[in-house]
Amino acid sequence: MKKVGLIGYGSIGREIMASAKRQEIPNAKIIAVFDKQSQVIDSVYNEYGDVDLFSDFDEFYNSQTYASLDIIIECASKDAVREFGGKIIESKKDLIILSVGAFSDKEYLTKLQYLSTLNSARILIPTGAIAGLDSIRSVRKYLDSLTITTTKHPKSLVGAPFFKSSKINLHNINSETVLFEGNASTAIDLFPANVNVAVALALAGVGLENTRVKIIADPMTSVNKHEIIAKGSFGQIHIIVQNIPSPTNPKTSYLASLSAIECLRSLCNENFRIGT
């Protein structure tokens, strides 16, 4: 039985916890939750009294509970990855990272990869709210171009740093509007809560600078849509994913939660895997 800890208890953390409690993840038991917000920790206690809870990372990190963990799942933010990722890897824990936008910092990515090798700890990035990362990885040496177009309802984009300097008023959008066209490195800085998928795609393929991203706001859509086009000497890959937004966080697709759950399930059943 693998002992699991969660960092962050937002919509994705709640879905992972609920799935584990329904015994849908064989060989996994969530025994700890860390979240900086004490009111969030209180809500976990009220719902699941048999889980050790922490709102201070040092207390969590130095606890006997932490020492017993096999796997930690980050489902908080890219800032949390940068703040805690190195320590977790140095403690020889396998780390599932959902806020892959943290790896727009190439130096930090290189650092974690080095620590991972040094400490024999694995870093896993779920496919998230898209599909086809296995295929993109398999043809990465043969890619000529890689693009992703993300379309979301304006309410899913509220709070994005992009709007601090843009003349576009999010609340006045009444038809499909292209907000951004550029590379994945710039996209994750301007839309950090919305395009982790672009960074995951870039890491699987041709890198952040060479992965093209278009972001569209559409007040008529009820789904989060991601369209991926990869072209090269191998042929062409065209993927369209239309996700239902998370019921508790419209910025996140429900598929992102399901992908994290499947990543944990696969990690806890190492004798049989589908896909690379």
Give the label of every model feature segment:
Residues 100-121:
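Rossmann-fold NAD(P)-binding glycine/threonine-rich loop
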Residues 74, 97, 123-127:
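General beta-strand structural signal in soluble alpha/beta enzymes
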Residues 5-16:
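Glycine-rich adenosine-cofactor-binding loop
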